[in-house]
């Protein structure tokens, strides 16, 4: 399938991603509630949240290498199967150790799906379409993040949190399996024909030294860490402040709804501010809002802050994908995306574990101050990133001239 062709595949990918991400977003708070019901403290919740990213940490680059030299589509059903199994088995687990293991399986499945899906978008989109198509692709994640917490909050309640959280995890596993219905022939078999041979692979060091790749990785790490800790620790904050699980689910879904709204207007925002300014401003505002969540605010103020924060966090993921893809050497874009996901998983391992330690020492609201500091650093990193990748204008459109023509013919 040539880049810039029919986008029916993108709609089906968004639908599949909505179900897969919805299952994960439903399972993550359910895992936290089930762990608390089984006797976990704040530190244990942080460790279990970190294990979710541990297996993917070692698998990301090999999967990216494989995708650079082959097809993207096989990773998608494999990811769905692992997510479904991880959710269901987490619900059946009777110990914190078993929950941690199945949480890791769930994370590995999510990694497989995301590497395959992001590589598919990069490969089947023309350069000037990538900001838009990655933005639309991440709407699938936002839809899942919108529905998942509400569903979890509706199912988790009452005195028997262990039983209700287990039910939520089983429902999440079943819901994820629905994603398989949208994945049939989503990638043309001829799309992988132009991939480089395995012997031609680009060294990881060269990819990481490409201007724009480190900045894209760090911004993505910061934004995802913020989203991840919000999902894992807002239930803990709710327990300490007396906020019901159903309300916590609504608060998390407000954040996701704001992220969807952001991505729907991403193209006009890029035209107005440009990629560098937009990333910098949203990371800076996100830092202030994360710190604000640590304050003992009423529920309505918490809802307002989470809505604004969701809008700010909606910018980082799609723009960091485009930054990394367009900065990476030819023939190594899937590996570059995998390195970006490795950075994400490093953040998902280190941030929850650090949050657990900080919460144990300074209280359950302290991790949000830590997130604010991380987003503040990412704002500085975004400010120093390239204003525009080769072959495109600041608003994401194609630059006219021989360089742009060559760029479009390179085959994403």
Residue ranges, per PLM feature:
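Juxtamembrane intracellular "pre-TM" segments in multi-pass secondary transporters
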Residues: 1-7, 187-216, 401-408
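Helix-loop boundary and gating motifs at the non-cytosolic
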Residues: 6-53, 215, 219, 225-237, ...
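Residue-level signature of mid-helix packing/kink "hotspots" within the transmembrane helices
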Residues: 53-61, 146, 256-260, 264, ...
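Helix-to-loop junctions at the C-terminal end of transmembrane segments
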Residues: 59-71, 262-274
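Structural signature of the two symmetry-related core transmembrane helices
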Residues: 74-88, 277-291
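Paired small-residue
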Residues: 86, 97-105, 300-308
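Cytoplasmic helix-loop-helix junction between adjacent transmembrane helices
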Residues: 104-141
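C-terminal membrane-cytosol helix-exit motif in multi-pass small-molecule transporters
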Residues: 153, 173-194, 381-386
